[in-house]
Amino acid sequence: APDQANKANNSGSAGVGGNILGMKGGAGMGYTVLTWTRDGVTWHRDRHTDKFFEPDPKVGAWDHAMAWVGSSVVVGDELYLYYAGYRWGHKYQHSVDRQLGLVKVKRDRFVARQAGEKAGTLTTRALTLDAQALTLNVAAMKGEVRVQATTASGEPIPGFRFEDCRPITADALAATVEWKQPLATLRGKPIRLEFSIRNARLFAFEVK
């Protein structure tokens, strides 16, 4: 998520009792939800309604009942997610029709903030940066993302306003934000970052 405070995004498994076509009631079905932490100690999990990865809805598919992501491996610009797929629920005929699956997603694209033709704005809390560059993980081929820096009280800083920012219109994992002034001039000052998103998705940002 485009929140620098989130230290990690990992997957967790969730299971609920329920009916699946061709199975007895309560056979159990499983899917994957996201968990996250801000301090590396306390973890939170999405609600059951916020599924990250679901079983194949096609009856008879090898992963129709269960799709539990276990391990992940970074391969270049992609994340390989290996998951356990069950044809039947985990309470039904154990060890029958179970296989391993692989899903490939672009790196660090678990969740996003997005907007349509009407631009939306996302504002961070106050930050004190010690950085020379800001990069965005975005999908903005049909729209654009701009960024402006404001004071902690919300006043746009000259040279770092939306109109001073070159629009990002790419599908990129690390698109560099360019203003009329270098980001290093804001070093040590409390600021907020505001993202203007139009027909685009913002997955993450990084300062370095």
Question: Which residue ranges define each predicted feature?
Answer:
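Carbohydrate-active catalytic/glycan-binding domains of CAZyme proteins
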Residues: 1-208
